[in-house]
Swiss-Prot record:
It comes from the Eukaryota. Pfam families: BCDHK_Adom3, HATPase_c. It is an enzyme of class 2 (transferase). Its main location: mitochondrion. One of its GO terms (cellular component) is mitochondrial matrix. Residues 138-368 form the Histidine kinase domain. Belongs to the PDK/BCKDK protein kinase family. One of its GO terms (biological process) is cellular response to starvation. Kinase that plays a key role in regulation of glucose and fatty acid metabolism and homeostasis via phosphorylation of the pyruvate dehydrogenase subunits PDHA1 and PDHA2. This inhibits pyruvate dehydrogenase activity, and thereby regulates metabolite flux through the tricarboxylic acid cycle, down-regulates aerobic respiration and inhibits the formation of acetyl-coenzyme A from pyruvate. Inhibition of pyruvate dehydrogenase decreases glucose utilization and increases fat metabolism in response to prolonged fasting and starvation. It comes from Ictidomys tridecemlineatus (Thirteen-lined ground squirrel). This is [Pyruvate dehydrogenase (acetyl-transferring)] kinase isozyme 4, mitochondrial. The record marks Y157, R161, W395 as: Interaction with the other subunit in the homodimer. ATP binds at residues 254-261, 293, 312-313, 329-334. It catalyses: L-seryl-[pyruvate dehydrogenase E1 alpha subunit] + ATP = O-phospho-L-seryl-[pyruvate dehydrogenase E1 alpha subunit] + ADP + H(+).
Amino acid sequence: MKAARFAMHSARSLSSVGLVPREVELFSRYSPSPLSMKQLLDFGSDNACERTSFSFLRQELPVRLANILKEIDVLPDRLTNTSSVQLVKSWYIQSLMELVEFHEKSPEDQKNLSDFVDTLIKVRNRHHNVVPTMAQGILEYKDTCTVDPVTNQSLQYFLDRFYMNRISTRMLMNQHILIFSDSQTGNPSHIGSIDPKCDVVAVIQDAFESSKMLCDQYYLTSPELKLTQVNGKFPGQPIHIVYVPSHLHHMLFELFKNAMRATVERQESWPSLTPVEVIVVLGKEDLTIKISDRGGGVPLRITDRLFSYMYSTAPTPVMDNSRNAPLAGFGYGLPISRLYAKYFQGDLNLYSLSGYGTDAIIYLKALSSESVEKLPVFNKSAFKHYQMSSEADDWCIPSREPRNLSKEKMAM
């Protein structure tokens, strides 16, 4: 316990004065090693070897943490000096230092393996509030200084990479904990958090019902679901893929919430609500899910903002010291959902018809061998993204009143 308190104090002290341990410099020189869904399954198969997973993670997790710590250091000083970002940085440094302690420990010793699982659980719990805490840091920064378009673009670039890094480290830790922990709490048909035969339609229906319950509570009404499935790969059979059900549920739940809200608010005076229509199609390479509503859509000028962090129609939340910090109001629903889709080489896009409705489309890889982690790496190319300077726009900006060329000719 004393060692843990000392590590936490040291991490905060180093972070507060802008210093990082030499271990961060060391591990940031390595690039992360992306895993495919198939490789993750192999780690958790019947022949899974805890020692192999231990040996991989004690190297890989510090590499991923160190890479993103280096990226935090190139952010504007006023941002990195906020109390929230300092706190996040101290968590990452402490976690890295705790994981590095296992580098010299033998994987043949069962106690080391058990201690490693305990450490992963501790790290995962420590990072529980990373998303809202970093979001609070961005808000603190924006409250103290004006953010120009170039800086805003850099923040968007950083947050995409920071949260993708978090998704990936959490995925690796969860896999090891669920498979090798003494307390088996996962679904017995899953390998860790991965379902080898994920029933896509079942996840869609579950996410819809969860959203419907919220909609009923708030609006006292909700639209129905109209679902169509097309299995172009194996006609007539149910649609199954290798995937992480919790990731898919997260994406669908967010999209259904938006679709239901738009539908109810747009059609409150209509005799009945139009259904939210979903079509799910399995092809040879991709699984595609399209969610369509008639909620009125949004103008083109707003569409791009929907995937921008900090854009939200909900009131800005207030952080407290509880472990249940809110995310609603930070504007993170859609951008985080898109990251979940992109994590295994998929995507999430919105197509809106202003005055009619919106189509939201999720693309996922149909083959587990092609579902490979999409990971940020801090290198010269990434560094350049943060060194961009604000330059004059090279496109004409229309004036409110067109120039009167006839008067200019007379003046000449």
